[in-house]
């Protein structure tokens, strides 16, 4: 069983640190492209951050989304997103910022139009929520603070458990993961909402876990070979190789689970799952090729 789970043998000798420059170039290019997309194209902010209205409906029979989109679109009340919510009878209508239309009036207008679109398919309104621009801005600020505090927490934890150099390497790798993931969100125009922020926080924890496993093995090997004249580069390479099989198997299992969620989970959960799919790929890559490379680079610079 153990051999079956050993995707890559522990005695493999891949020179990851020898390829660190290549990894840094690839990551540098991806970060530059991601930042360019984020600052030029921007993120497709959802109602949570930009403000707007959410209306959840439940029909007696499966709803015709194309008819609903065309009918509501004819009202010309701003950006509209209409999608199923869980099953074909449940519909979620998202409206962007409207032209200062009171919520009650907006709700009446939409209800009347919905009844006109498909009079033979009765519906009930399960909820109506409105997020104002001020609340949206406040949520943006809180989301950024959540990501910042998560990274500060990681810095403190890794610095205490290992040493400051490892903490710097881990933080830079996490920032790398978040920036590139945001770049893909911008590129694909996926909706950026609170569930995506939750996915980014989950990504930070997931990527850190993989990095900690590698760092822990490096620390053990440094202690075990303290009296031997072994190059730190060889120690770090050996540690990455020993944990490589575990890292890849864990990442693949998580990746396919989240990929299934993205494909079959419906439109509402798609941005969350997409963020994790990209994050797992980038996070696994950074745990193997970036985090340890950064630690080695910093250690090398300190010796000069």
UniProtKB/Swiss-Prot annotation:
Top-rank lineage group of the source organism: Bacteria
Compartments (UniProt record): Cell inner membrane
Presence of the UniProt keyword Iron in the record: no
Cellular component aspect of the GO annotation: plasma membrane
A Pfam family it matches: Sec_GG
InterPro entries noted in UniProt: SecD/SecF_arch_bac (IPR022813), SecD/SecF_bac (IPR022645), SecD/SecF_CS (IPR022646), SecD_SecF_C (IPR048634), SecD_SecF_C_bact (IPR055344), SecF_bac (IPR005665)
One of the GO BP terms on file: protein transport by the Sec complex
Transmembrane annotation, as ranges: 20-40, 143-163, 164-184, 195-215, 244-266, 276-298
UniProt entry keywords in alphabetical sequence: Cell inner membrane, Cell membrane, Membrane, Protein transport, Translocation, Transmembrane, Transmembrane helix, Transport
Topology versus the membrane: Multi-pass membrane protein
GO molecular function: protein-transporting ATPase activity
PANTHER family: PROTEIN TRANSLOCASE SUBUNIT SECF, PROTEIN-EXPORT MEMBRANE PROTEIN SEC
Record-stated family: Belongs to the SecD/SecF family. SecF subfamily.
General function of this protein: Part of the Sec protein translocase complex. Interacts with the SecYEG preprotein conducting channel. SecDF uses the proton motive force (PMF) to complete protein translocation after the ATP-dependent function of SecA.
Assembly and oligomerization: Forms a complex with SecD. Part of the essential Sec protein translocation apparatus which comprises SecA, SecYEG and auxiliary proteins SecDF. Other proteins may also be involved.
Protein name as it appears in the record: Protein translocase subunit SecF
């Amino acid at each position: 069983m153990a051999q079956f789970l050993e995707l890559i043998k522990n005695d493999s000798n891949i020179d990851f640190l020898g390829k660190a420059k290549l990894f840094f170039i690839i990551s540098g290019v991806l970060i530059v492209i991601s930042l360019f997309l984020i600052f030029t194209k921007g993120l497709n902010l959802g109602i949570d951050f930009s403000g707007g209205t959410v209306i959840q409906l439940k029909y007696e029979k499966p709803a015709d989304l194309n008819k609903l989109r065309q009918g509501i679109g004819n009202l010309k009340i701003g950006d509209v997103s209409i999608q199923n919510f869980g099953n074909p009878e449940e519909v979620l209508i998202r409206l962007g910022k409207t032209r200062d239309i009171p919520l009650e009036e907006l709700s009446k207008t939409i209800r009347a139009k919905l009844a006109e679109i498909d009079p033979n398919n009765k519906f009930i309104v399960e909820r109506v929520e409105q997020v104002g621009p001020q609340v949206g801005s406040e949520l943006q600020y809180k989301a950024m603070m959540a990501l910042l505090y998560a990274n500060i927490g990681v810095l403190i934890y890794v610095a205490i458990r290992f040493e400051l150099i490892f903490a710097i390497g881990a933080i830079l790798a996490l920032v790398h993961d978040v920036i590139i993931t945001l770049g893909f969100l911008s590129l694909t125009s996926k909706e950026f909402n609170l569930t995506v922020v939750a996915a980014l926080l989950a990504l930070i924890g997931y990527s850190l876990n993989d990095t900690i496993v590698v760092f822990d093995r490096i620390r053990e090997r440094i202690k075990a070979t303290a009296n031997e004249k072994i190059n730190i580069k060889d120690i770090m390479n050996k540690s990455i190789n020993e944990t490589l099989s575990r890292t890849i198997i864990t990442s693949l299992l998580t990746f396919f689970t989240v990929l299934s969620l993205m494909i079959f989970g419906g439109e509402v959960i798609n941005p969350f799952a997409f963020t994790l799919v990209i994050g797992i790929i980038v996070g696994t890559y950074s745990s193997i090729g970036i985090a340890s490379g950064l630690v080695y680079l910093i250690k090398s610079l300190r010796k000069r």
